[in-house]
């Protein structure tokens, strides 16, 4: 009995300390920068949501960002993600309400022309200037997303655009989508800035997806360039596909404190699970001794 209890105790301690050895997120945390990290590695960590909540890209990474965007890699990365979405969709049996949900800015419409004029992400995001650019309605299509969109339409999927753009931009957004080559969609959902129930992007998009599901839509795929496009609940039976965003990644619904605590929550849950398992071993040993 003593031996079983000792082994169980070691098991719990080992599992609980495993968090220290295998953290779920980089210990640099919320928006932190490690100077010795190369720009390509920094970008990868951002895309993987290990670095988040930053206001600008590092100044020393501007040239690397330009090379990434204007070279072959950015389009190649976009192509790979869109291809995987298509390969997944191609193997599905399509039903009338099966739907793919797309974000707009940075996903179907490129905002690279804006960032090209504003430091490729090294300048702090200015919503007023960005809105002025959006209202011109000249955003080009992201070519690989447009190809995927056309393929999904031909397969029979409903297309829903779910954007953080506000309702007052509906007309310019519809015109820009058509100008860029997106000629048909089921719904265009824009944000009501007066709605207090959705204070951030994740809660807004979660609520929008919940409404779609209540309306009978079956969300089978979500494609976006921001983690806020993909996080949250009510994603139906979907797979999510994260497109690269080389210039900026907006903060998700997690605050810095919540984000840093998330791995600890999982860590505590794991310890409780292992502790319960160890307790069962002890009880079993005691019962055997009694019998």
Swiss-Prot record:
InterPro entries given in the database record: Acid_phosphat_B-like, APS1/VSP, HAD-like_sf, HAD_sf, Veg_Stor_Prot
Which superkingdom is the protein from?
A: Eukaryota
Q: Does the keyword Phosphoprotein apply?
A: no
Mind listing the UniProt keywords for this protein, alphabetically? Glycoprotein, Seed storage protein, Signal, Storage protein
Q: Which Pfam families match?
A: Acid_phosphat_B
Query: Which residues are reported to be glycosylated?
Result: 126
Q: In which tissues is it expressed?
A: Accumulates in the stems of developing soybean seedlings.
What are the recorded GO MF terms, alphabetically? Answer: nutrient reservoir activity
Query: Which CDD domains does the record associate with it?
Result: HAD_VSP
What does this protein's UniProt record list under function?
A: May function as somatic storage protein during early seedling development.
PANTHER family, A to Z: ACID PHOSPHATASE-LIKE PROTEIN, VEGETATIVE STORAGE PROTEIN 1-RELATED
Q: What is this protein called?
A: Stem 31 kDa glycoprotein
Please report the organism this UniProt entry assigns to the protein: Glycine max (Soybean)
- Gene of this entry: VSP25
């Amino acid at each position: 009995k003593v031996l079983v209890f000792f082994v169980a105790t070691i098991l719990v301690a080992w599992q609980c300390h495993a968090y220290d050895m295998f953290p779920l997120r980089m210990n640099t945390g919320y928006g932190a920068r490690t100077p010795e990290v190369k720009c390509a590695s920094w970008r990868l960590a951002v895309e993987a949501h290990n670095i988040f909540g930053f206001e600008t890209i590092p100044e020393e990474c501007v040239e690397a960002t330009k090379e990434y965007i204007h070279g072959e890699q950015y389009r190649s990365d976009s192509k790979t993600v869109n291809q995987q979405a298509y390969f997944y969709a191609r193997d599905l049996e399509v039903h009338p309400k099966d739907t793919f949900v797309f974000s707009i800015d940075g996903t179907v419409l490129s905002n690279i022309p804006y960032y090209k004029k504003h430091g490729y992400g090294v300048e702090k995001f200015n919503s007023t200037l960005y809105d002025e650019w959006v209202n011109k309605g000249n955003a080009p299509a992201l070519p690989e997303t447009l190809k995927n969109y056309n393929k999904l339409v031909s397969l029979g999927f409903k297309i829903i655009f779910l954007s953080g753009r506000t309702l007052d931009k509906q007309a310019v957004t519809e015109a820009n989508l058509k100008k860029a080559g997106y000629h048909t969609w089921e719904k265009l959902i824009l944000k009501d800035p007066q709605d207090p129930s959705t204070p951030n992007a994740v809660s807004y998009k979660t609520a929008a997806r919940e409404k779609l599901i209540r309306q009978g839509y079956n969300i089978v795929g979500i494609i976006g360039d921001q983690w806020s496009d993909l996080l949250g609940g009510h994603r139906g039976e979907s797979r999510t596909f994260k497109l690269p965003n080389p210039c900026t990644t907006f903060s998700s619904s997690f605050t810095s404190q919540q984000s840093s605590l998330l791995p600890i929550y999982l860590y505590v849950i794991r310890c409780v699970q292992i502790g319960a398992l160890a307790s069962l071993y002890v009880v079993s040993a005691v019962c055997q001794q009694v019998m």
